[in-house]
């Protein structure tokens, strides 16, 4: 059997029932951890009907005594992930973050940008500390980002994690590995640190950072929005009080799209002879 992966999911074979000394009561199952030896899965995490010889998918991490332990709980993230986690308590060594399993995740002071506060949440990177062989979190996420993206194309869909607000817009983490940015004028919805959203590649810059948008790029997006706008007109007596001369902020507030996309959609509906266009409104053709 290959070496188990700490802080990650593993598929392990059930070896035997774990029995308490003295009364012989079962308190879980022992799983085959290969070179790591037998790994306990406590009784409360054992799926009903599990038998000796079965293979089970479990998350393996370290218990209070730094021994590998298996659980069927679903963590909020695993080793190699960036995540937005809440600080649950602190001591003289660092902070401890809730991440969906019984034992909280340790973030030492040296890995904090500023002292973490109980109840606040932070973007962190989860990794296995090579010196202590402990699962730890680091709030210095820029040290773990890959600034040499490869193969991205304009308009490609990606996964985004909102990292932090800046004067330019929002820093994001792209596909759990690269730094990116959504400019303020490209944000047409409420977003918050820790949000996970679908996004689209706008530009890959020379410095390796990626400019993203939250809307599909190009003509297809305008065509899709044209159908949304058409339905809006049908639902509102055939009138929309936004036209070519309307403010971009008013369009953004109403439809969560840019003025450019709105004008393309209006042009599409006009070419199809479905609307008439006025400076401050559009109307369905009756």
Q: Could you say what each language-model-derived stretch is?
A:
Residues 1-286:
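Single-stranded RNA-binding regions, centering on S1/OB-family and related RNA-binding modules
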């Amino acid at each position: 059997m290959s070496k188990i992966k700490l802080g990650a999911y593993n598929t392990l074979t059930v070896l035997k029932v774990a029995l308490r000394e003295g009364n012989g009561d079962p308190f879980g199952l022992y799983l085959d951890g290969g070179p790591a030896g037998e790994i306990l899965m406590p009784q409360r995490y054992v799926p009903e009907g599990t038998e000796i010889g079965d293979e089970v998918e479990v998350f393996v991490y370290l218990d209070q005594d730094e021994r590998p332990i298996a659980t069927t709980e679903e963590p909020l993230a695993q080793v190699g992930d960036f995540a937005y986690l809440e600080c649950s308590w602190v001591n003289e060594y660092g902070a401890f973050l809730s991440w969906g399993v019984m034992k909280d995740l340790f973030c030492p002071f040296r890995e904090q940008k500023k002292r973490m506060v109980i109840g606040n949440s932070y973007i962190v990177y989860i990794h296995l500390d090579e010196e202590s062989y402990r699962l730890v979190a680091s709030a210095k996420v820029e040290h773990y980002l890959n600034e040499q993206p490869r193969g991205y194309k304009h308009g490609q869909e990606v996964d985004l994690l909102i990292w932090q607000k800046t004067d330019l817009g929002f820093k994001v983490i792209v596909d759990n590995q690269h730094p990116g940015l959504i400019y303020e004028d490209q944000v047409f919805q409420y977003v918050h640190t820790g949000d996970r959203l679908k996004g689209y590649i706008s530009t890959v810059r020379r410095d390796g950072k990626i400019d993203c948008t939250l809307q599909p790029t190009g003509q297809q997006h305008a065509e899709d929005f044209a159908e949304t706008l058409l339905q809006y007109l049908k639902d509102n007596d055939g009138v929309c009080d936004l036209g070519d001369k309307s403010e971009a902020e008013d369009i953004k507030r109403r439809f969560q799209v840019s003025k450019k996309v709105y004008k393309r959609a209006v042009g599409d509906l006009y070419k199809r002879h479905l609307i008439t266009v006025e400076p401050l409104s559009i109307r369905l053709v009756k």
